[in-house]
């Protein structure tokens, strides 16, 4: 889909077809190139795609991690890249892998699983992001069902040997009994267009299909 303002979109074309799964795409800029990760449960690996003609053409160039990991999100802190993933199907554990290169190899964090047996906060809901000098990890609350709520974790400590986070006060996000995301919400991705900070999210007011929403930061 294409847009002139980041709010209103029109479908353009299918840019990636895969026999396995193409959910949870996150795009990264490395030098002058653009790369993308997608979830890897059915493929049994986390693959890295490179844009040949951004954003219309992509090719798989590497495998970052082997195993049925879901919802990968990479964040760079200092000279270290951290790859956040969660375990599939039950979604109750979160793991971190680190590398001194975006392209790996990624090694397991000594505190894994950094979240253990907690369906409320284990599964990623979007990209790890920084705002007002604080680092955040949006998470899916899968306690009762898939994609019920999005909660927000503040990452207090992140290194190759340590990890600590806490849930913020206004969590779950934008949740009201009569709101647009009353029964479902499972995506929260921050992005910037020019000087505007925006969020791609979704929600359902009743037990129906999730609907995409673009929200501007005031």
Residue ranges and their predicted role:
Residues 1-218:
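Carbohydrate-active catalytic/glycan-binding domains of CAZyme proteins
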């Amino acid at each position: 889909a294409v847009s002139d303002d980041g709010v209103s979109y029109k479908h353009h074309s299918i840019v990636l077809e895969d026999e396995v799964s193409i959910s949870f795409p996150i795009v990264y800029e490395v030098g002058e190139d653009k790369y993308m990760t997608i979830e890897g449960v059915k493929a049994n690996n986390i693959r890295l795609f490179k844009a040949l003609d951004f954003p219309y053409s992509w090719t798989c160039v590497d495998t970052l991690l082997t195993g049925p990991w879901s919802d990968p999100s990479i964040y760079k802190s200092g000279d270290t890249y951290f790859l956040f993933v969660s375990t599939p199907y039950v979604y109750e554990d979160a793991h971190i892998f680190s590398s001194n290169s975006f392209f790996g190899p990624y090694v397991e964090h000594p505190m894994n699983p950094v979240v253990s047996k907690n369906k409320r906060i284990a599964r990623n809901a979007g990209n790890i992001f920084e705002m007002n000098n604080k680092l955040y990890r949006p998470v899916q609350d899968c306690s009762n069902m898939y994609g019920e709520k999005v909660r927000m974790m503040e990452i207090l400590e992140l290194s190759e040997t340590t990890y600590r986070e806490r849930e913020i006060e206004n969590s779950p996000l934008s949740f009201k009994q009569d709101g647009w995301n009353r029964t479902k919400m499972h995506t929260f991705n921050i992005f910037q267009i020019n000087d505007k900070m925006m969020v791609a999210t979704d929600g359902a007011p009743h037990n129906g299909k999730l609907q995409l929403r673009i929200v501007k930061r005031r």
